[in-house]
Amino acid sequence: MNKRREKGQSHSTRPPHPQPPQWLVFTPEEIELLIAELAKKGYGPSMIGIILRDQYGIPLVKPILGKGVSEVLREKGLHPPLPEDLLMLIRKAVNLRRHLDEHPKDYHAKKGLIDLESKIRRLVKYYKRRGVLPPDWKYDPEAAKLLVST
């Protein structure tokens, strides 16, 4: 009964070959500097990948550097404290709670919040198992407001 996940996700077509393209004008060092510069401007790993693809013509970072954008950020100490997908879900939940404060009779939004928070809890459980989050980390809606606002 996965009624919330029936639609496809839009995405760009990935390059067919895993080796770096021959027309690429950037060296691996320059790409790492670009990634660090974009991270310092406040962009997340997925947004950095999109900017590198659209503005700099770098289709994929991994075949060129041998590591992904998140790994580069982790090496340089610029990675976000929470995984990006979890942070976006928490941000969505905070916005939905704000909506429900203004519209308490919106039952469809209430159901959406229940589903969203259960998705957050499942993702937290996964990240605890993988060692990405500390074992005592818990999702708290009140603390999430502070987390998202910073």
Curated annotation (Swiss-Prot):
Q: Which GO terms describe its cellular component?
A: cytosolic small ribosomal subunit
Query: Which Gene3D superfamilies does the entry link to?
Result: 4.10.860.130, S15/NS1, RNA-binding (1.10.287.10)
> Which Pfam families has this protein been placed in?
Ribosomal_S13_N, Ribosomal_S15
Record keywords: Ribonucleoprotein included?
yes
Protein's recorded name: Small ribosomal subunit protein uS15
Any idea which GO molecular function terms this record carries?
small ribosomal subunit rRNA binding; structural constituent of ribosome
Instruction: Report which superkingdom the organism of origin falls in.
Output: Archaea
What are the BP-aspect GO terms? translation
**Keywords recorded for this protein, A-Z:** Ribonucleoprotein, Ribosomal protein
Which family is this protein grouped under? Belongs to the universal ribosomal protein uS15 family.
